[in-house]
């Protein structure tokens, strides 16, 4: 059986989708799984053994372009027995429909009654995103209840030779860290500061960790480079050599190798949080307005710190200076350090 997955467009969602691919291999041991996703996803999909190949989705997030979707679908005809559509959007279901794939499975989403012929309508019965993904591995009449959904934790393979090449490439940037064990920080998050632990808290935590004998490496995209530099500059000058800002200096593949080399990771609710979980790093996940009930790090080595209760608070702008959210400001560096030390002592 050949299965086409229409994959998600965000790092965290892509990582959680790996639980689905693992379950599909259990349900259909001889199946081939191809994933259509943005080009940047390819390094992640290449590290998932269950995926045969990644197919580039050339359209950006939000682009409709029905003609392009028709041509893509037509090019995939007579290649697949089943399609599973993970995004909820109407447009994401067009390609399998145009490909004339017989079985087209997904959640109802934006009223996709014609485009999907194996439609699941009870999404609210599955409170976690990963449960919703894995549920699509099952036939409609045997789908387990949420509490019985088997969630196989996402993982990314890390090849020692490739990782060694990556570490060598960044030798110059990390030389001053010496032999100190490295704690990775992932201080960025989509949609701005409202989901971020304040940079001054990260700086204070870095100062305490460096004083304890650790080094700190900052990870993120080019958009996160400024906040990484804010963290470094907030450190006492004599400690800055033990903190390296790699945000914007790595591609995603290199970030995976470097994060896998860290002793532990401290992170906001972000895509890199899910990557740190997938390479089995002990991690402290800092949550504020977003809810770990929906998209937690899927790892036995994760400790979540969240001081407020309830589900997702839809906020794109923080309520305090710098755009930070009060619920994240209230998480002190001392709290994070205490939980991190407990985690490392296990």
Swiss-Prot record:
InterPro entries: Glyco_trans_9, LPS_LOS_Heptosyltrfase, RfaF. Signal peptide: none annotated. It catalyses: an L-alpha-D-Hep-(1->5)-[alpha-Kdo-(2->4)]-alpha-Kdo-(2->6)-lipid A + ADP-L-glycero-beta-D-manno-heptose = an L-alpha-D-Hep-(1->3)-L-alpha-D-Hep-(1->5)-[alpha-Kdo-(2->4)]-alpha-Kdo-(2->6)-lipid A + ADP + H(+). SUPFAM superfamilies: UDP-Glycosyltransferase/glycogen phosphorylase. One of its GO terms (molecular function) is ADP-heptose-lipopolysaccharide heptosyltransferase activity. GO terms for biological process: lipopolysaccharide core region biosynthetic process. One of its GO terms (cellular component) is cytosol. Gene3D superfamilies: Glycogen Phosphorylase B. Keywords: Glycosyltransferase, Transferase. Pathway: Bacterial outer membrane biogenesis; LOS core biosynthesis. Its EC number is 2.4.99.24. Transmembrane segments: none annotated. It is an enzyme of class 2 (transferase). Glycosyltransferase involved in the biosynthesis of the core oligosaccharide region of lipooligosaccharide (LOS). Catalyzes the addition of a heptose unit to the heptosyl-Kdo2-lipid A module. Belongs to the glycosyltransferase 9 family. NCBIfam families: heptsyl_trn_II. This is Lipooligosaccharide heptosyltransferase 2. It comes from Haemophilus influenzae (strain ATCC 51907 / DSM 11121 / KW20 / Rd).
């Amino acid at each position: 059986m050949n299965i086409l997955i229409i994959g998600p467009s965000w790092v965290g969602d892509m990582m959680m989708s790996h639980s689905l691919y693992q379950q599909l291999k259990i349900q259909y041991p001889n199946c081939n799984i191809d994933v259509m996703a943005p080009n940047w996803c390819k390094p992640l999909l290449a590290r998932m053994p269950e995926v045969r190949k990644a197919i580039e989705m050339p359209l950006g997030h939000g682009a409709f372009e029905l003609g392009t979707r028709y041509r893509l679908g037509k090019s995939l005809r007579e290649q697949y027995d089943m399609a599973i559509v993970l995004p909820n959007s109407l447009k994401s279901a067009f390609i399998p429909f145009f490909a004339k794939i017989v079985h087209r499975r997904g959640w109802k989403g934006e009223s996709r009654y014609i485009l999907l012929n194996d439609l699941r309508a009870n999404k609210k019965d599955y409170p976690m995103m990963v449960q919703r993904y894995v549920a699509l591995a099952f036939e409609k009449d045997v789908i387990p209840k949420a509490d019985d959904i088997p969630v196989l934790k996402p993982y990314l393979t890390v090849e020692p030779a490739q990782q060694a090449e990556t570490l060598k490439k960044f030798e110059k940037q990390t030389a001053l860290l010496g032999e100190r064990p490295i704690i990775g920080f992932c201080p960025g998050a989509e949609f701005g500061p409202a989901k971020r632990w304040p940079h001054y808290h990260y700086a204070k935590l870095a100062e305490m960790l460096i004083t304890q004998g650790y080094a700190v490496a900052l990870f993120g995209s080019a958009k996160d480079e400024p906040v990484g530099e804010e963290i470094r500059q907030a450190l006492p000058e004599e400690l800055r050599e033990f903190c390296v800002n790699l945000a914007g200096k790595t591609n995603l593949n290199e970030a995976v190798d470097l994060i896998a080399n860290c002793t532990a990771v401290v992170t906001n609710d972000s895509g890199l949080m899910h990557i740190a979980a997938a390479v089995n790093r002990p991690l402290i996940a800092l949550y504020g307005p977003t809810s770990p009930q929906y998209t937690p790090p899927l790892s036995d080595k994760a400790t979540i710190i969240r001081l407020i209760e309830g589900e997702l608070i839809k906020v794109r702008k923080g309520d305090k200076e710098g755009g930070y959210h009060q619920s994240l400001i209230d998480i002190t560096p001392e709290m994070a350090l205490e939980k991190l030390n407990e985690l490392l002592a296990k």
